Each structure stands twice: as C-alpha cells, then as structure tokens.
Amino acid sequence: MSCFCSVQEEFYCEVLLLDESKLILTTQQQGIKKSTRGSVVLDYVFSHVNLAETEYFGVRYCDRSHQTFWLDPSKTLAEHKDLIATGPPYTLYFGVKFYAEDPGKLKEEITRYQFFLQVKQDVLQGRLPCAFNISAQLAALAIQSELGDYDPYKHTAGYVSEYRFVPDQKEDLEDSIEQIHKTLLGQVPAEAENNYLAIAKTLEMYGVDLHPVFGEKQAEYFLGLTPVGVVVYKNKTQVGKYFWPRITKVYFKETQFELRVLGRDCNETSFFFDAASKTACKNLWKCCVEHHTFFRMPENESNSLTRKLSKFSSLGSKHRYSGKTAMQIGRESTETLPRADLQVIRTRSKTYPKRSTQPAGRNNGGQAVTKMENTSEGQPKTSALTPVKSPRVKAESASVQQEKPSAPWEEDAPQSGLYNSASERNKSPKFPKAHRRSPSGGSENEPRHRRGQTADDAQANKQHRRRSRSRGNTSSGSESENSNREHRKKRNRSRQSNEMVDSAPQWEVVLRRQKEKTPNDPNQRRSRHRSRSRSPDVQAKEQLWKHIQKELVDPSGLSEEQLKEIPYKKVETQGDPIKIRHSHSPRSFGSTGAPTARTERGLCCPKSTLALIWFLLWL
C-alpha cells in the first residue's frame, strides 16, 4: 500500500523562467510531492532566480481549456485540481504578478532585470502594444543591454534582424532600431534596462491583467486589472476606468461578476458582467481582490478589507491575500536591500537567421534559398527564406484568425512559454511524446508496393473500383437512372428466345442422382444455413411423380367443357407428424406480435395428408 501511495505522490514539474530557461522540480531531487504546499514551490523558484523582492512575482499554470491561474501558496499541489488534470508532466510559468507603478523604484537590480524581461516579453507577444517610434526606442535599448555599444566591425548590416522585439517585425523598423542604437553609447545594461522600463510604464496597457467578459446583449468586453484600478475595454477601446479607492464592493455569483463603484456624488453604481464559466468568474474575483489589497490598502487596513471583500463572494468562496502590500514594501527599512554582493547574470536572447538583403527568393517560384553567412564567432550560419504560401493556406490562416476573440492587443507574433499551444507545453525530456503513424501514410517498415503507387496503378485501381460499383446494386436513385435500367431490361428480354423442350429426361436424371447420393458423399455440397424450401420426404416425391403426366397434350381436339375442367388425382402419403417449435425472435413476429410456427428441417410429412397437385394440361 505504501508503494502505491508513493507512486501517486511522485511529482515532476517544469518551471519556465522569463529568460526562456527551465527549472526542473522533481520528487527525487527537491522532494516535492503532490501534498507539498505552493509556498514551497515558490521558494524554490525564488531561490533559483536569486530574488529578494518576491512579492511582485508568482507562478501560474494553464488548465486544459487554456485558462490561467496563479499558484496559491496556502494550498497543496493536489488541491489545484486544474493543475493536476494537465499532467504529468506539469508545467508552471514564472512571471510578474503585480506590476510596480514605477519599476525604477525597485530596490535591487535583479528585480528590475526580471521586470525588464517580463515587459519585453509582453511587447513581443503583443500584450503591450506601442507605436512605431516607441517600439524602435524600446528595441534599441534592449539591443544596447545585450550587445553593448555599437561597433561597425562587429555589428554588420542586418544584425538587428537576428532578434525579435515586436510582432510581425519589418525591415524598416530594424533600420530605425539600428540608427537609435548608434546613439546609445556608454549605457551599461542596468542603465539601458531602467530607461526601457521608464518608457514602458507610460504606455496605456502597461501591467494590465485582462479578463474576457460579456456585457449587455452579450457584447464582448475586457476587464483589466492595473496598479491604479480597473479598466474596461470594448472593441480595443477603453470605455471605463475605476480607481481602487472608488471601488467599494467586488462580488460574484455563479458566472455573474459585480463591480460597485462610488461616484463623485457619493452614490454607488453597480456594473454587472458575465464570465464564460463559473471557474473563470471566480478567478476574476480572486485576482481583483488581490490587486485591490496589494495596491490600495495601508498596512493596518489590508487584512480587514480582505475579510470584508471575502464576505461579498458567493457562499463557500473565501479568499484572503496573505502577502505584503505595496505600501508595506515601501515603508520597510532599506538596510538589508539592496544586497552588496549581488551579481546579476544575464542570459543571451534567442537569435534567428539574419534577414537576407537580396530578393533572390522571389524569382524562384517560392522555393527556399539557403545562404551561408559568417558570424562574429567565426562559425557559419544558415539562413533560409520563408517559402511562399499558397492562396488556400493564406485563406485558411485568415479564417482561423477571424475566429479568435478580439482583444486590445494583436497576437500575430510567434508566442512562447505560457502562450504556447498545449502540445508544445507538454513536451518533456522525461515524458517523451508518443509518435503515431498516420493512417493515410505508410510506415518505413511497410512494403514499398503498399506505400506508393504510380499514376498507371492509380488509374487501374480507379477503373476497377468503377467496374465494381457498376456490378453492385448501388445507385443514386434518380429518375433518369431508373429509366435507363428499365430500358436495358427490355432490350435484354427481347434478345432471349423461348423454345419448348421435353423435360422428362432431365427429371429422370435428377431423380437418379438423388437416389445415388449418400450422407457421407464428399462431393455433395452442404450449406451452412437451413433451406426452408427443401422437402425432406423423398418417398413422397417418388409416389407423386408416378401419377404425374409428363407428356404434352394437344388441346385442339378437346371441347369447351373439357378445357374448363382440369383433371387431378388424390395421392395419400404416410409419415411422422410435424414438430412445431415457436420462435420468439423479432423476425418471426407478425404484425399482431404473436409468434409464428415453423417446420424444422428433417421432419416428415404428417399422416393422411392430402397433397393436391394441380397440373396444367396445356401451355
């Protein structure tokens, strides 16, 4: 029993960090089990990243419906039902939970560096939209932080195209980034990152945690939780903004979410929204309570307001934010922070093939053109032009994009991490993905003649299938097809010639063969099914055939009375009585539902049964 419990408690998890590296948490290495609380997992992640200002960060996960949830430090991993249902393996995503109003006031450089990585990811994935000139400034500062000062010998033409900063990055933007990068001489990485955050914090969508909801007449809205309050978006336009001091009540019941706001005339106004599910509505309420507590409440009022907000929820749903608030963090003494011996280790960003300046790929019919370029490290790098998509593929991709719900940001960039597809998130070195063979394509071990066919073979198979269908009884049921079929039947009947022959010798041969047959005759063909039309009494047949007149009679010399009367003879046979068995199968029931009787094979005719045989004496 203990072994069975240990298998259930085994836990394997991958934590994706902001620098695109992974932290593996397992039962064997860190001793993390399903009964471990979320605070232990957070401590391992914070220790690995070397964070001291941990209140701004958290770990989230996705359920099977791609709904995101923050890991609750007070609950065990097993209590996160949506997380357990996705694995193993389990995937967590480290990121910023509460965006600081002024990231420049963060005390440690490592904290600002993690904020820089998070905001840069938001811009790349389209969650933080910005204008062309702002995008160029932010990207130039990111290049300065990673590559340092511009060097014409190291940074050759097109070096900016090796990095990705915005969705659908164009060549003109890369040229602007290169020009701005030349003007940033002397800025060290920490200074460039601070300038990056100083520009990003002024953007409208900075730090907005969006939740899709429905308003009146099922209109699509987005509720955004920000450091200053709640914003409402409709059709990518801000239609409302409510500051945290004005929000007096947050309530949810089933899928309905209520936001009560105090107006300037001291009158309260309630705004109602509908979420997609009860789980999504509860998650919106929890995030709203945590944001309200973290950014709004002083130290002595945070716990009381959290308890007050928890009473406004539905029955049985109580949630309390137990961490420090932004005001508490600001009032703490700065004696321990920043740490004197702290060293920030920055990782290189992911690079891509350099953009080709020669439009040679356009003259090759959309075929990929590969070029070799020398990098600064002296190793050759391969760059390939993207093949041209067919109009059908473009139409399908456009239809898929139209099915996505509209949001205040664009999602055209290749997403990674938390915003990947479910198939990409579940990849793991410990749990490799099983390879399935496509039913339409043959495997490598399959014979070649089964996998591939020439054009002649395909045409022959097609003709063979056409002939098979013509021999079958399948038809479309159209009137023209039925008329053609009737016409063919009449034509075939007209070709046949009916000729009268003497059948007496044929019948004698048949009777002689039946007498010669024995039960053990191997040449006798046996049927697996019972024949209902076969008579088992051979002796009765012989007696009847003796009285049958086989010669043809000429009716020309008969009178009218003789023609009207048909002569017949009475023949009596003897045999065992018939055994009747009632069948209750559905097929044997008539319209009234009463079972019908049937005669079994091998039984004789009843005694004194009159067999009335009528034979025509003329044709």
From Swiss-Prot:
Residues 11-299 form the FERM domain. It comes from the Eukaryota. Residues 471-481 have a biased composition (Low complexity). Pfam families: FA, FERM_C, FERM_M, FERM_N. Residues 354-385 have a biased composition (Polar residues). GO terms for biological process: actomyosin structure organization. Residues 323-541, 579-599 are annotated as: Disordered. In adults, it is found in the ovary, eye, heart and brain, but not in gut or skeletal muscle. Its main location: cytoplasm. Residues 510-519 have a biased composition (Basic and acidic residues). Keywords: Calmodulin-binding, Cytoplasm, Cytoskeleton. The keyword Cytoplasm applies. One of its GO terms (cellular component) is cytoskeleton. It is found in: Cytoplasm, Cytoskeleton. Residues 428-438 have a biased composition (Basic residues). GO terms for molecular function: calmodulin binding. The keyword Cytoplasm applies. Not known, binds calmodulin. This is Band 4.1-like protein 4. It comes from Danio rerio.
